[in-house]
Amino acid sequence: MTTSSNRQSSDALYQDALTHIVGGVNSPSRSFKAVGGGAPVYMERGEGAYFYDVDGNRYIDYLAAYGPIITGHAHPHIHEALMNASSKGLLYGTPHRLEVEFAKKLKQAIPSMDKVRFTNSGTEAVMTTVRVARAYTGRELVVKFSGCYHGHSDLMLIAAGSGPATLGSPDSAGVTKATAKEVITVPFNDVEAYREMMKEWGDQVACVLVEPIVGNFGIVEPKPGFLQAVNDITHEHGALVIYDEVITAFRFTYGSAQQVYGIEPDMTALGKIIGGGLPIGAYGGKAEIMETVAPLGPAYQAGTMAGNPASMATGIACLEVLEQPGVYEKLDALGAKLEAGIREAAEKHDVTITLNRLKGALTVYFTDEIVTDYEGAEKSDGEKFGRFFKLMLENGVNLAPSKYEAWFLTTEHTEQDIEETIEAVNRSFAQL
């Protein structure tokens, strides 16, 4: 097992970064604030299932860039596609062949999308679906589930209040109270709370945003019947169902969580995996709804870099890798092996955990309670997770620096990687 106690170059880079970059990082999630502080690890390169930092340490990577790198780092097929595209020009500002090819490929994989439009990020995709839903329905209120993250647009940075349903309050400075009043939050997996909320507000609701499988307070599956009930109740009140599949699309099957549960939304927002590692977003839905978007309709959305050739090329290449036989079966088998090893280690070292896994993604919560909603995830011991995170790093395993994030497997992880990871878990649990 590789250990990585020497990180002097990372420490020095962090001190330099603090002078030039806000907080030393370009996204708060990269900070180690949630795991006890200190300098984050600065990576030099990624290769397959591994990261190599600026001090030469190797890590088995389960961050996978918070999910997008399902094919591992620097996958040869995706790299080749990027090189070919870049040799012809990275940005056109005009229509081109690759955006048509990629749109067709996404539609084939996710049949609920009659029409598709590309954006630059998942945040943009979600933000635009809400705008389109409001334009289509003529209504203003938006519903989301407590603890579910839908990007950093003002409307989505709303925290859950107390009680079964509440008008939101701002979760970030700079988000106005007026904006917060446009969002209603409801506990995930609670059909009755959703039903009661819609009885009160349904005639004003434009849409509900749903992570069909939660990925932002760990991996949490919907309870049986929950997604169908949300669809039925929403449509009874004339509102639209939007699936935020930025994390879930192509993570658990070739396609989306819609195929896993057999339920179709009105619109779908995509990101992360579909770019093969490059910035991307997309949204799609029923033709009559999507025709609300300019230039056909009054809902405006645009982007200089939307549909750029590089992202289209890597996106197509990524899906070509994922559609090969056996990909998701391998991810599931490795996930099962990792889960069994973590559970055995927890029992051996008398460490209390709850583990949620779906195929190639899992979350370890330091709590004895079953986690089916955000309230349950909050009970995970953050201080203990912080110590576990740093111990795993010392033992050559890279995780997300937050108790709420998932471990993501890639097509490049091997059984040997899983065995090394289980060894690291045992060493770390022994020191908690």
Curated annotation (Swiss-Prot):
Pfam families: Aminotran_3. Its cofactor is pyridoxal 5'-phosphate. The modification N6-(pyridoxal phosphate)lysine is found at residue 272. It catalyses: (S)-4-amino-5-oxopentanoate = 5-aminolevulinate. CDD domains: OAT_like. InterPro entries: 4pyrrol_synth_GluAld_NH2Trfase, Aminotrans_3, PyrdxlP-dep_Trfase, PyrdxlP-dep_Trfase_major, PyrdxlP-dep_Trfase_small. GO terms for cellular component: cytoplasm. Its EC number is 5.4.3.8. It is found in: Cytoplasm. It comes from the Bacteria. Pathway: Porphyrin-containing compound metabolism; protoporphyrin-IX biosynthesis; 5-aminolevulinate from L-glutamyl-tRNA(Glu): step 2/2. GO terms for molecular function: glutamate-1-semialdehyde 2,1-aminomutase activity; pyridoxal phosphate binding; transaminase activity. Keywords: Cytoplasm, Isomerase, Porphyrin biosynthesis, Pyridoxal phosphate. Belongs to the class-III pyridoxal-phosphate-dependent aminotransferase family. HemL subfamily. Homodimer. This is Glutamate-1-semialdehyde 2,1-aminomutase 1. It comes from Exiguobacterium sp. (strain ATCC BAA-1283 / AT1b).
